[in-house]
A protein has these predicted regions:
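Intrinsically disordered, low-complexity segments enriched in small/polar residues
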Residues: 27, 40, 44, 62, ...
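Short, positively charged, Gly/Tyr-enriched micro-motifs
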Residues: 77-141
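N-terminal alpha-helical interaction blocks
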Residues: 1-58
């Protein structure tokens, strides 16, 4: 793959995923899973599961404190816009660090989901615009 192709692919991925997601997280894998049930239109679809891990960069260090990597928090599931008739689930792993000055576990905070949901902020806004509220039905979850 040429550098230009890599650049175009990255630009495309930035348009597909939630805003700024690829700035802080890197794609580590994906898989497609078949869903045996049919949707309300009688079409069998699948689910695209995308794995992302936070880049190794603690964003809010306190001056004079030192931080040591300490693995990852449990992956969070975030529902995003369907892609090619497939439900999209983002499995997002955030890093954690130990503040060696205080001994506390710390991590970066991101607004990845709309409040009270497991939907990406943009997807929840779209659903709210379409339905007047965010529906609690399985075709979107």
């Amino acid at each position: 793959m040429t550098t230009r192709e890599n650049d175009l692919l990255l630009q495309f991925m930035e348009m597909v995923f939630p805003k700024d997601l690829l700035r802080y997280f890197e794609l580590t894998g994906f898989r497609e899973e078949a869903i045996s049930e049919k949707d309300r239109f009688g079409v069998e679809s699948g689910e695209l599961i995308v794995n992302l891990e936070e880049r190794d960069c603690f964003r809010n260090p306190i001056e004079g404190h030192t931080y040591r990597p300490n693995g990852f928090y449990e992956a969070s599931k975030v529902r995003d816009f369907p892609l090619r008739d497939k439900k999209m689930t983002l499995l997002i792993k955030r890093r954690r660090w130990i503040d060696e000055t205080t001994g506390k576990s710390v991590g970066n905070n991101y607004e990845l989901t709309a409040e009270g949901t497991r939907h990406s902020v943009e997807f929840a806004a779209f659903l709210k615009e379409c339905f007047g509220q965010i529906p609690d039905i399985s075709i979107f979850a």
